[in-house]
Curated annotation (Swiss-Prot):
Highest taxon above the source species: Bacteria
CDD domains: Ribosomal_L10 (cd05797)
Keyword hit for Disulfide bond: no
SUPFAM superfamilies, sorted: Ribosomal protein L10-like (SSF160369)
One Pfam family named in its UniProt record: Ribosomal_L10
Gene Ontology terms, MF aspect: large ribosomal subunit rRNA binding; structural constituent of ribosome
Gene Ontology BP terms: translation
Entry protein name: Large ribosomal subunit protein uL10
Organism: Sulfurimonas denitrificans (strain ATCC 33889 / DSM 1251)
């Protein structure tokens, strides 16, 4: 790989990491190409990106994006996205099905985190689920009021 190619990769990754709310580092030793392709498909469905990058290039790109505090060792596959919960869910769900896929560390909400924090974020409801819960909470008083009015109407009709 030439210096210009490395510089291009660093520039692209730096821009990607600046926009990302979470970057997760995972070990993928022993996984087949087809399983990694399944990970990429899962990630694409959640607007999350997956890439294997050399540790030195990733470290430079992360520092350019003001993300420091995590040391990269051994082989790593990087998973990143704008939604911390969705990115964490992609990694956690894939790790459940593939024991060789191990979450090592991460930046979650742009702060250094361990695998336990990634697992905790994966258990949170997603954005759509939270919006549905909020709408249901807002609609509860109106729904109860409507049910009460309907019961009152039925009672008056019977009398």
């Amino acid at each position: 790989m030439t210096k210009t190619q490395k510089a291009e990769i660093i520039e692209v990754l730096s821009n990607e990491f600046k926009d990302a709310q979470s970057v997760i580092f995972c070990d993928y030793k022993g996984l087949s190409v087809s399983k990694l392709e399944n990970l990429r498909k899962m990630a694409r469905a959640k607007d999350t990106k997956v890439q294997v990058v050399k540790n030195t290039l990733a470290t430079i790109a992360l520092s350019n994006a003001s993300l420091t505090g995590v040391e990269l060792k051994d082989t790593n596959i990087l998973v990143w996205g704008a939604d911390s919960v969705a990115t964490s869910k992609v990694c956690a769900d894939f790790a459940k099905d593939n024991e060789k896929f191990v979450i090592k560390s991460a930046y979650v909400d742009r702060e250094a985190a361990d695998a336990a924090k990634v697992e905790a974020f994966a258990k949170l409801p997603g954005r759509e689920e939270l919006l549905a819960m909020l709408a249901a909470t807002w609609m509860a008083p109106v729904t109860c009021f409507t049910i009460g009015l309907d019961a009152l109407r039925q009672k008056k009709e019977e009398a």
